[in-house]
């Protein structure tokens, strides 16, 4: 009996080696900087492409926030401005590698950053969206 066949026989008896179809969903925030030469239609089409990709791979879009055209702190690919887009979504942890590949392949994307949100950041974002003042915001008297 080879090591591989012994290991697969051993692994077949334990459920922790099997893939779990009910994977735990994690909360993420994605910021993408698109090239500023996009038209409004292309900008929206790029956003829809990535939201559809998230949904097609078992994720759920929580909130979408297009910031529009902003100045960059330093030039990226000889561009001094970029179209910013922030997306909050829920997805399994193995999904982010697939999303990264899609973002790197897209010629309209200058930069991107995906961040895993902890429960406090999720609560903060939900409160901020609902209009409830958070601890860091000043309440006008």
Describe the function of each predicted region.
Residues 2-9, 13-21:
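Short, positively charged and aromatic/hydrophobic N-terminal segments
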